A protein has these predicted regions:
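GHKL/Bergerat-fold ATPase module in large chromosome/replication-associated machines
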Residues: 113, 131-154, 174-178, 184-685
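GHKL (Bergerat-fold) ATPase N-terminal catalytic module, capturing the glycine-rich phosphate-binding loop
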Residues: 1-175, 179-180, 188, 195, ...
Length: 685
């Protein structure tokens, strides 16, 4: 006779709340249903091993089946089953004890509910309008029972016709969830959540191509691997086993660099395999490629908090029964086991890298360009990893040679220490574009590092903080003699008037490039150095680069690129330009320069007079005199600049020198490059 009653829940009609309010990810129901069936099967195996079950275990396969016509999805097992009393206890009562409390506590963290309060079974009501359980306990003399519920607090229990032990859960899929009656959808979910469960899971039958079409065979379509690689002893595995498993997880990826097999049972349980993938570009820098499992049941690929942030770039699998199936972010932040796991993984990765470095440095160096992104990220984001990695992290020079931090310091300390005792690390980020600057450094006997990685800018900033009395400077940040200043610089022999004229000759002819500023300066660099150089200020360039990494630095990112045009006043061509400029403009400029000198002398007298007075004693007339004199000077200088600019405009040597400097820096393009080529041909005819 059928028994009817109400589920032990004080809130009316809890199931719509489960379905609509608590869960955004309805897919999770299938994981819960299948993992419950797997648990029931494993419990039977345990009872048999302990001698508490004497019968035949028989077929342990968990089966998932669809009936599109009936609108049902069924999950069945041959596990321990349930008696009527157990259904009442575990389905009607325990699952909803304290339901009001958990609704209040977990409404902000919906995914933390299922499992935490035994709600795994009731997740089925996220997709089903009615659920039926037909079950028979393994216990001798047990009767089969059918339980059914339509989503209200009311349920019904009645006798059932079932000969074999185990349970079958029949989900009558709701009208708004019909996608869960599609074979492809169920295959997708089973592959996501169940592909490594510890008991065989079958979904339909295997097919074969016959008579021009796919036809079903009698063989079960087992969707999972019950003994994934991480559950096996590392000593029994070969490299090919690890690579094959990697490609099972990530079919389209290249072979990994190497891997770490995790296996610890105290003070927490943790197994897994972490792979170092080959990252070829920023496009490949994808997090959330590590899959978290609990007893071979997929939990999530959002592993922040479990795996240190820098290792979220790794691929692989972590399995720990100490992390529940349904984890919340707050849980991860507070749980002591999770913190221990994170620390353990960091240590394990550092130890593995260190062992490769010590045992086979050649192999380590060969893989460094691929490993660098992981190690640098770790050193930047985690102090304890920096301390572990500083002895095996490498620096690479432009010749392709590798050095530890200490080795490189020893290499350069004698020749690359400036007059203030600072060790100067020169680096380039593009060997081709910065070739001439690199060569200039080599001619001085300097070593140049190659820092072309995605994280090298923040690494440079960090190393300047970590390495005592050290600074990093890009080779094109200044002229070579000022990159490592060993003595006071030689001053130019030009007068102020000559410097002003020469500066204006070149300043007036600089190209107008979008978001780019040029500042002209004059240095005495020696007759053998280049006539014109372009350098980029190290601080501003680095701040612009850092704006891509740090919030709050957008100000620098919006600023124009700033370059210095350095004129070598010792070079014959620069001297010739100045001489020609003076010869061609002297007569025209003579009265203007005289006027400027006269007005500047007058301005000096006016300032001298005002300096004798308090601000409030200075009359408006005196203020106007200063303003008018300053304006007169400005007007005369504008006239001077216009005359010099007119001369420079028609001076091919000026244009050629500027374009050569731009060309050297990869900044001469389009119409400007075409004009340079034509001018070059004309000048050598």
């Amino acid at each position: 006779m059928a028994q009817k009653g109400n589920i032990g829940v004080t809130t009316e009609n809890i199931f719509p709340v489960i379905k609509k309010f608590l869960y955004s990810d309805h897919d999770i129901f299938l994981r819960e249903m299948v993992s419950n069936a797997v648990d029931a099967t494993q419990k039977l195996k345990t009872l048999a091993a302990q001698g508490d079950f004497k019968g035949e275990i028989g077929d342990t396969t968990v089966r998932v089946s669809l009936d599109e016509k009936a609108g049902t999805l069924t999950i069945s097992d041959h596990g321990i089953g349930m008696t009527e009393e157990e259904i009442d206890k575990y389905i009607n009562q325990i699952a909803f004890s304290g339901v009001t409390d958990f609704l209040d506590k977990y409404k902000e963290n919906a995914n933390a509910i299922i499992g935490h309060f035994g709600l795994g079974f009731y997740s089925s009501f996220m997709v089903a309008s009615k659920v039926e359980i037909i079950t028979k306990s393994y216990k001798e003399g047990s009767k089969a029972v059918k339980w059914s519920c339509d989503g209200s607090p009311a349920f019904e229990i009645e006798d059932a016709d079932k000969a074999e032990r185990g349970s079958g859960i029949i989900l009558h899929i709701a009208d708004d969830c019909k996608e869960f009656l599609q074979k492809n959808k169920i295959e997708e979910l089973l592959n996501k959540y169940c592909k490594f469960m510890a008991v065989p899971v079958a979904f339909g039958k295997k097919t074969e191509w016959k008579d021009g079409k796919n036809v079903e065979t009698d063989e079960d379509n087992i969707i999972n691997n019950v003994e994934p690689l991480w559950t096996k002893a590392p000593s029994t595995l070969k490299d090919e086993d690890y690579k094959k498993f990697y490609h099972t997880l990530y079919p389209m990826q290249d072979d990994p660099l190497f891997w770490i097999h995790l296996n610890v049972d105290f003070p927490f349980n943790l197994t897994g395999i972490l792979y170092f993938p080959r990252i070829k570009s920023s496009i490949d820098m994808q997090r959330n490629k590590i899959q978290l499992y609990c007893n071979q049941v997929f939990v999530t690929d959002q592993v922040e908090g479990i795996v240190p942030e820098f290792l979220t770039l790794l691929h692989g699998v972590i399995d720990s029964p100490d992390i529940p199936l349904n984890v919340s972010r707050s849980y991860l932040q507070s749980d002591s086991n999770v913190k221990k796991i994170s620390t353990y993984i960091t240590k394990k990765v550092a130890d593995r890298l260190n062992s490769i470095f010590k045992e086979n440095r050649k192999e380590f160096e060969e893989k460094w360009d691929d490993l660098k992104i992981f190690i640098n990220y770790g050193m930047l984001s985690q102090e304890d990893f920096y301390e572990r990695a500083k002895d095996f992290a490498l620096l690479k020079d432009v010749e392709g040679k590798y050095f530890t931090f200490e080795e490189y310091k020893t290499l350069i300390k004698d020749n690359q220490t400036d007059k203030d005792g600072n060790l100067v690390y020169l680096y380039a980020n593009n060997k081709e574009e910065q070739y001439s600057y690199i060569e200039a450094a080599k001619q001085k006997g300097y070593s140049v590092l190659l820092m072309e990685g995605q994280l090298d800018t923040p690494m440079v900033n960090m190393l300047e903080q970590k390495l005592e009395k050290s600074r990093f400077t890009r080779v094109d940040a200044d002229i070579i003699d000022r990159l490592i200043v060993k003595e006071d610089a030689k001053k130019t022999d030009l007068s102020k008037e000559q410097s002003d004229n020469l500066t204006e000759v070149f300043r007036s002819q600089m190209p107008q490039l979008d978001k780019t500023e040029f500042f002209v300066e004059i240095q005495a660099l020696g007759e053998q150095n280049q006539p014109v150089l372009i350098t980029q200020n190290e601080y501003m360039r680095r701040m612009k680069a850092m704006s891509q990494f740090q919030a709050g630095m957008n100000f620098y990112g919006q600023m124009p690129d700033s370059y210095n045009i350095v004129l070598n006043s010792d070079h014959a061509l620069v001297k010739k330009v100045l001489e020609d400029a003076e010869a061609n403009t002297a007569e025209t400029l003579k009265p203007i320069l005289a006027e400027i000198k006269g007005q500047e002398a007058r301005l000096a007298v006016l300032h001298q007079e005002q300096n004798k007075k308090k601000p409030e004693e200075i009359t408006q007339q005196e203020k106007d005199d200063v303003h008018n004199t300053e304006k007169a000077i400005s007007d005369e200088k504008a006239k001077r600049n216009e005359i010099i600019s007119g001369y420079a405009k028609n001076n091919n040597i000026v244009h050629q020198l500027i374009d050569l400097a731009l060309l050297q820096n990869g900044m001469l393009k389009g119409a400007s490059l075409d004009a340079f080529l034509k001018r070059s041909v004309d000048m050598i005819k």
